Amino acid sequence: QLGSEGLGAGNRPERAKAAAEESMEDIKLMLNDGCKMAFITAGMGGGTGTGAAPIIAKTAKEMGILTVGIVTIPFLFEGNRKIDQALDGVEEMSNHVDALLVINNERLRDVYSDFSVMKAFGKADDTLSTAAKSIAEIITLRGTINLDFNDVKTVLKDGGVAIMSTGFGEGEGRVTQAINDALHSPLLNNNDIFNSKKVLFVITYSPNSELMMGEMDEIHEFMSKFGKDVETKWGLYIDESLETKVKFTILATGFGIKDVPGMDSVLNKRTLEEQKRLEEMEEEEQRKDERRSDFYGPNILKN
């Protein structure tokens, strides 16, 4: 529970922010147990997630913890006010995390258009937890070629906006299928993975259908598409439940806040609003100058 009342934020981020600040010592106590990485998951657009998540993230990062934000932004049908509030929260969150994954619920609707509304919201929540679990499993599961905490930290530390996706392949060319499946995921938010600065990917297969040397050429071909300045980490993992399939998971960082869908318009709007505010301030100052001049004469302007 954040704050002393436990009554929710009433769609007011400032109330949730105050509650989080009130509970700061409890938050620090919870994090101060040898924690090396914290996932801050939230639904942006309401009060609690939008207001409290950035405060919790800021606290974790200041404690030296690798801090990863994983947030959703609203469906279009939830309205512009909630969307704008969500994008404000995303922008604030980006200032206080090492890496930020933004899941656009509207992209999920494109994939699961036949879902009921309740099931769609449930899928959004599942996607949050799946993303956190996938990152954690890269560290905790054993593989043929392992990736450890430091590998993940290298990619996520000061990584900016991140994107993550998983794809599957089966049969002839299954590795290429899995890679293409991941690269065409709506969760990538139309970002070009090859514009990332750091990338980590994992190929998972079943021992019942071993990964062949020829298939490694498909992995090499994918890796060769990245520029020489892009830092890449990769691993091979085993999952018996895949049977004859392979799974390809990719995590890329180094994108900017403008790469979040809808953020460009918010920032442009904010720039226009700021320009208008400055013009209004200038007009107000001019009005005051003229008023002083009316009462004290024009020389008052030179004093």
Task: Name what the model sees in each region.
Residues Q1-N303:
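Tubulin/FtsZ superfamily GTPase core signature
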